[in-house]
């Protein structure tokens, strides 16, 4: 028996795939209620439109910034009740992945981590704007990623780059 630590296990961890969330933050946030206060006196029959987008960029070393943008427009009848947009971002340490795994991680896994924070920020803004709470349904980023890959293949485009 030896008093020496098993350095082989540490070396394997350093050489294998690594993923670590470093920071989550709001990059941009906006709320507009163009028809207030008149909109508050109308019967509330909302229709919700959600637009989402993700982008990623490399930082120094093996660090990446992923930004999830959610834009929500709620109409009450023919009028816009409110528009809210959040850019929820995260810094991730990612290394040791092949191109396909890196693309999936940046395009689906990281946005999945960011979504609950963006959803909460939107809900808080809506409530502070004196509107009923808006709880967005979960988003299947894996399915969206797969659809985008299929669309690109059918269009003859190269698969999603790992960085932009």
Swiss-Prot record:
Keyword annotations of the record: Chaperone, Cytoplasm, Protein transport, Translocation, Transport
Record-level GO BP terms: protein folding; protein tetramerization; protein transport
Molecular function in Gene Ontology: unfolded protein binding
Pfam families: SecB
Protein localization: Cytoplasm
Domain of life: Bacteria
Gene3D superfamilies given in the database record: SecB-like (3.10.420.10)
GO cellular component: a single term: cytoplasm
Cysteine pairs bridged by disulfides in the record: none
Subunit (UniProt): Homotetramer, a dimer of dimers. One homotetramer interacts with 1 SecA dimer.
Family listed: Belongs to the SecB family.
NCBIfam families per record: PRK05751.1-4, secB
Function (record text): One of the proteins required for the normal export of preproteins out of the cell cytoplasm. It is a molecular chaperone that binds to a subset of precursor proteins, maintaining them in a translocation-competent state. It also specifically binds to its receptor SecA.
Protein name as it appears in the record: Protein-export protein SecB
Native organism: Pseudomonas syringae pv. tomato (strain ATCC BAA-871 / DC3000)
Gene: secB
């Amino acid at each position: 028996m030896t008093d020496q630590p098993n350095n082989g296990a540490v070396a394997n961890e350093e050489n294998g795939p690594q993923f670590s969330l470093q920071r989550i933050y709001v990059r941009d946030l906006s709320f507009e209620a163009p028809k207030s206060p008149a909109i508050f006196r109308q019967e509330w029959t909302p229709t919700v439109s959600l637009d989402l987008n993700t982008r990623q960029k490399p930082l120094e070393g093996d660090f990446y910034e992923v930004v999830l943008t959610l834009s929500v427009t709620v109409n009450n009848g023919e009028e816009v009740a409110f528009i809210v947009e959040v850019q929820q971002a995260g810094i991730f340490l990612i290394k040791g992945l092949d191109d396909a795994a890196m693309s999936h991680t940046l395009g689906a896994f990281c946005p999945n981590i960011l979504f609950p924070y963006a959803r909460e920020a939107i809900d808080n803004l809506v409530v502070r704007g004196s509107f009923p709470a808006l709880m967005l349904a979960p988003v299947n980023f894996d399915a969206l990623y797969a659809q985008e890959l299929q669309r690109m293949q059918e269009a003859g485009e190269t698969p999603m780059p790992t960085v932009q």
